[in-house]
Amino acid sequence: MPRKGAPAKREVLADPMYNSKLVTRLINHLMLDGKRGTASTILYDAFDQIKEQTGNDPLEVFEEAMKNVMPVLEVKARRVGGSNYQVPIEVRPDRKTTLGLRWIVQYARSRGEHTMSDRLAREIMDAANNTGASVKKREDTHRMAEANRAFAHYRW
């Protein structure tokens, strides 16, 4: 364990096109092998498609999608007396955002549309409409936490 405490979190810079730190974080999650230019092109194309298809501001649609995907509760394994319990815990705000972004990108990659920008645009629009695989993942996570509510007193 480090003697000086945890290292300071680095702040991400706001995206130059949409002036949003959340968009920068989505680009970082999309990025593979350090190719930031490719990732930002994919995202901007997806946002253009969202604007065409919905007629709304793509940033607002994306923020609505994030609100629908971010989990409130999750389960964490805790060992008590030789058996493992899935203990429901509240999700920290920074982890909520990270999980939401991760799930949107993960389920966009597994979709069947032709290009990644198509997949990402569809996943964001589905999430904004409270449908789609990433919203289902959040509901499954909440269902798991609800099912294990009896073990909530094992929180630490």
UniProtKB/Swiss-Prot annotation:
GO terms for molecular function: rRNA binding; structural constituent of ribosome; tRNA binding. Disulfide bonds: none annotated. Keywords: Ribonucleoprotein, Ribosomal protein, RNA-binding, rRNA-binding, tRNA-binding. InterPro entries: Ribosomal_uS7, Ribosomal_uS7_bac/org-type, Ribosomal_uS7_CS, Ribosomal_uS7_dom, Ribosomal_uS7_dom_sf. Gene3D superfamilies: Ribosomal protein S7 domain (1.10.455.10). GO terms for biological process: translation. It comes from the Bacteria. GO terms for cellular component: small ribosomal subunit. Pfam families: Ribosomal_S7. One of the primary rRNA binding proteins, it binds directly to 16S rRNA where it nucleates assembly of the head domain of the 30S subunit. Is located at the subunit interface close to the decoding center, probably blocks exit of the E-site tRNA. Belongs to the universal ribosomal protein uS7 family. HAMAP family: Ribosomal_uS7_B. Part of the 30S ribosomal subunit. Contacts proteins S9 and S11. NCBIfam families: rpsG_bact. This is Small ribosomal subunit protein uS7. The lineage of its organism: Bacteria, Bacillati, Bacillota, Bacilli, Lactobacillales.
